[in-house]
Amino acid sequence: MKILIKGAGDLATGIAVRLHHCGYPILMTEIEEPLTVRRMVAFSRAVYEGEAVVEGITGVRVQTPEEIRKAQQAGKIPVLVDPHAAIRTAYQPDVLIDAILAKKNLGTEVTDAPFVIGVGPGFTAGEDCHCVIETKRGHTLGSVIFRGSAIPNTGVPGDVGGYTIERLLKSTSAGVMEPVASIGDLVETGEIVAYTGGEPVYAKMTGIVRGMLQQGVNVEKDLKIGDIDARCETSHCFTISDKARAIGGGVLEAVVQFERIYRKYAVIVLAAGNASRFGSNKLLADVQGKPLYRHMLDKLAGLGAFPRILVTGYEEIAEAAEAIGVCTVANHQPELGISHSLKLGLEKCKSIEPEVKGVLFCVCDQPGLSLSTMMELIRLAVNRPGMILASAHGNRTGNPVLWDREYFSELEKLSG
């Protein structure tokens, strides 16, 4: 299973190391001039040094698909200068992790890969990604969020050794970065640790320089250029942090969960009813500015990890579904009832994926149904083999419903 990580800073590196240790092939992308403060524990350093070794694992700068392949075969992590991760189209990762840590989404979409993970604030699970990893220090650090967002950025760094804002080093002027202190040096309060744009930057506390931007990089005023650690443990400067390990653990948990369901379940949407009670084709009715059926297709677009089948007798709906890679089955006999659509969809599903473990059956007229709910039912199914799982509101169950393959033969006998 191929994994693409956007960003190669220290937190992204913590993620990459966790995944690498578990045998996943990794590709990381970076900007041309990385601004990683904790660069001694970041594979982004490979961009300007050619390679970077972090806890025995080597990250190496690459430029071509062949170099990516060779680096992975050699047990290394390739780092590609590709600010927008355009390599995604050719590389076709199974999992995409946005670990840029920009505190906002810079363009990642839930359709970028079968499984998309957003790291930190700026992402919403079920909208622009499948899950979010909490990055704020504290009780929930490293948590996997399958519905909603991470804690918003407060602008105040987490407590390390009893210090928060004081431990940050920020540029005093825009211009070229000129470090005076090196990573691992002990500095005193008031000591000059760097110059930015020719202006001195002073330490606000005593401690060890845990991170510092590289010589010659261009910075804006008030940019974080370094940090000081009051704990004065030199080894902390050259090893992955507790925060990065926790975040990496959260990502690993999400990836393993996804791997257990990847291509093992299917989604079938029933959209062939003649809407006799509605009086016309309700799936074409405008709901919140677009046809009703479009709401379901938007959800299906984010479920590319699974075979997706839509049963319909309407050409417009079929064409729209096929345009996003959804397989369609024609049902020109809606009068035979919903069971006919169900059987047509199940037959097609079994021809595509004979060993599918279960099917999530959905109806097409639920605009309020969320992608998160659909994913949750599939994730629950893997730990509840042989069961029928349904969504519910209060004590009332309804669609969608996930049927284990154990019941396929009975479903195929239904009528009406």
Sequence positions of predicted segments:
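Conserved hydrophobic helix-helix packing surfaces used for dimerization/oligomerization
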Residues: I3, Y265-V267, V359
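Short, hinge-like loop/turn segments at secondary-structure boundaries
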Residues: F43-E49, G325-T328, L346-K348, Y407
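Short glycine-rich anion-binding loops that position phosphate/pyrophosphate groups of nucleotides
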Residues: L101-K103, G122, G273-A275, E315, ...
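N-terminal glycine-rich phosphate-binding loop and ensuing alpha1 helix
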Residues: E32-P34, R263-E315
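Conserved N-terminal catalytic core of the sugar/cofactor nucleotidyltransferase
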Residues: R294-G358, S372
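Well-ordered secondary-structure scaffolds
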Residues: M1-Y262
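Active-site oxyanion/phosphate-handling segment shared across diverse enzymes
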Residues: E406-G416
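Conserved beta-loop-beta/alpha segment of the NTase-like Rossmann-fold superfamily
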Residues: E335-R405
